């Protein structure tokens, strides 16, 4: 038991919960299976769903992404979950996020909702061991999932979302304290390297809806400068941006993103756009920008605070609810 006491184990068993032990070597997917096995019948009724479950409000749940939503009602911090189960949810989260980023995500969650588990909810979609199973965690500025490759062709198990509001909603131009703002600074370093003609192609006036992250494939034009129009040093800088974007996530997810990207043409089939709309402080450090390919979208909305929408696959023919 995570909490340890034999008396607590007896109480858990009496209420219909299974005791939980976290193996020293485990994946998020295996821990999600343990969480599923630990649930009492009433818990399963509240947070477990069939693989193709269509939510009356959100649609197909396993492909839903949002900036501020809850797939289920019970908060992770609530007494709906046992202490063991809460620790198990945290262990899943910690294995999805690289250790170097745990403190930064904790700061984001403290600022946005009062800390880990406060306002966060969990859904378990499908059945462990069936080949169709997904762990989904949602809340303010969070859509995070893992599925052990249950969803064909898709990175991260499906679209994800992250963001941060340091406080008050409207941040200053330098976004002090925002844990994700360095990603935008990295992208802006690419813009600074562009010459006048390149900047004219990269800078776009019309900002799309932030949740418009459906794939365009090769049928629709994508705004921004083609990566093939970058010089070798500019492209190398863009590679650094991609590495910084992927840095918070576990190795398996980083590799899956790169694999999906390679199978649909790599960075050379992408475009990079910066948006003149929403330039906080009119300092030409572009708060809003987007890296996009036929089936790759990383949309960074920095104004008035950071929202980031991510949708990556190796095929553009995939469903999305955003």
Where are these regions (language model features)?
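A cross-kingdom marker for long, charged
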Residues: 22-41, 45-322
């Amino acid at each position: 038991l995570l909490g340890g006491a034999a008396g607590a184990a007896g109480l858990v068993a009496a209420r219909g919960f299974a005791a939980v032990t976290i193996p020293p070597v485990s994946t998020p997917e295996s821990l999600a299976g343990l969480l599923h096995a630990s649930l009492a019948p009433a818990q399963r009724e509240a947070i477990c769903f069939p693989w193709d479950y269509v939510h009356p409000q959100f649609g197909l749940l396993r492909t839903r992404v949002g900036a501020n939503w809850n797939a289920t009602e019970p908060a992770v911090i609530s007494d709906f979950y046992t202490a063991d189960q809460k620790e198990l949810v945290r262990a899943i989260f910690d294995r999805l996020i690289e250790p170097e980023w745990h403190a930064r995500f904790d700061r984001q969650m403290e600022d946005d909702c009062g800390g880990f588990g406060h306002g966060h909810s969990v859904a378990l979609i499908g059945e462990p061991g069936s080949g169709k199973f997904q762990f989904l965690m949602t809340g303010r500025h969070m859509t995070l999932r893992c599925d052990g490759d249950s969803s064909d062709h898709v990175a991260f198990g499906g679209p994800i979302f992250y963001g941060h509001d340091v406080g008050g909603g409207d941040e200053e131009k330098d976004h002090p304290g925002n844990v994700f703002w360095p990603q935008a600074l990295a992208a802006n370093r690419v813009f600074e390297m562009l010459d006048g003609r390149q900047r004219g192609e990269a800078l776009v006036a019309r900002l799309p809806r932030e949740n418009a992250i459906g794939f365009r494939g090769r049928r629709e034009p994508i705004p921004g400068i083609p990566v093939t129009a970058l010089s070798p040093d500019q492209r190398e800088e863009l590679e650094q941006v991609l590495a910084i974007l992927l840095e918070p996530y576990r190795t398996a997810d980083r590799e899956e993103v790169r694999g999906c990207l390679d199978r649909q043409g790599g960075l050379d089939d992408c475009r990079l756009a910066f948006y003149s709309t929403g330039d906080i402080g009119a300092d030409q450090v572009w708060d809003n920008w987007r890296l996009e390919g036929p089936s790759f979208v990383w949309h960074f909305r920095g104004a008035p605070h950071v929202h980031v929408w991510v949708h990556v696959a190796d095929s553009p023919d995939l469903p999305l609810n955003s």
